[in-house]
Design a protein with these regions (language model features):
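Histidine/cysteine-enriched polar flanking segments
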Residues: 1-287
Length: 287
């Protein structure tokens, strides 16, 4: 796996996409807009602050005004959910980029840049107020490469693994959510991490989704498991992988029960399939 500062999961409600997701036609394409900003040669392109943009099968949250066109996105490992990105102008994309995706502090290699250039590449938290309903993510997220438009192996493995994970998670007493996240604006919500502290398996929520290409088709099936920062084990202890994203490769349906038991419930990495990982401080994990 390559290092990244943030993975942006665009909620498309679809299971597959064109080989290059930025080339998708037939409607709105938030991934293309973000790649225009953060891709090679983009306005905010920074080799020391990689933003990985992926499409996902998760559905977007219904907007407050049903006639408005909107998109949703997950930010990981920040564990933020952006429910409403109005798609009537580029303003919401800029707010997402400037308020959440740009680095808070630039790499020392940028010290030679002009003050104006450094300022343009640095996060401005004031932009966060332009995006409504942003929440901390308290759900376990299981992401499976199902990008058949890029590689047929992923198109075969993805749906099979999704079904198997949903089955085994339910048997482990997690509630598997398939519907869109519903956000009611104006409600007083405590979205701090401490508010979501819960033992995984004790009625906790898990979401299993297909995602676009993450590299390494030879490792199909590719799976990334994100454990929310406030997660605890059933024994009430801090989950050893809380706030982390764990990457696995060559996962087959027969391996899923073990991954649920060891990684999601037990906080242990399965070495045989481990491709890498990332923690909440963006440090790469290895064994």
């Amino acid at each position: 796996m390559s290092s990244y500062a943030e993975q942006v999961l665009v909620c498309t409600g679809r299971d597959d996409w064109s080989s290059r997701i930025e080339d998708e036609r037939g409607g709105d394409n938030l991934a293309a807009d973000l790649k225009e900003l953060f891709g090679r040669g983009g306005t905010y392109s920074d080799p020391y602050h990689n933003i990985s943009v992926l499409n996902s099968s998760f559905p977007s949250s219904p907007p407050p005004r049903t006639q408005a066109q909107s998109a949703s996105a997950y930010l990981l490992p920040s564990f933020k959910y952006i429910p409403f990105l109005p798609r009537v102008s580029f303003d919401s994309v800029q707010a997402l980029a400037k308020g959440y995706l740009l680095p808070e502090k630039l790499h020392p290699a940028h010290d030679c840049l002009s003050p104006i250039h450094r300022d343009r590449l640095t996060r401005k938290t004031a932009y966060q107020r332009l995006l409504l309903g942003v929440q901390d993510v308290a759900d376990v997220l299981v992401l499976i490469c199902g990008h058949g438009g890029r590689d047929p192996r992923c198109g075969i493995f993805g749906p099979l693994l999704r079904d198997e994970f949903e089955d085994k998670l339910a048997k482990a007493r997690l509630r598997v959510a398939r519907d869109a996240v519903r956000v009611q604006l104006g409600q007083a919500e405590d979205t701090t991490a401490s508010a979501h502290a819960r033992a995984i398996g004790d009625g906790a929520v898990a979401r299993v989704g297909l995602i676009s290409h993450i590299g390494g088709h030879k490792f199909a099936g590719n799976v990334v498991i994100y454990i929310p920062p406030a997660s605890r084990t059933r024994a009430g202890e801090q989950h050893a992988l809380a706030g982390c994203g764990i990457w696995y490769g060559r996962v087959e349906p027969k391996h899923v029960e073990g991954l649920v038991r060891e990684t999601i419930l037990g906080g242990r990495v399965v070495e045989d399939m481990f491709r890498g990982g990332i923690d909440s401080k963006r440090r790469l994990l290895s064994i």
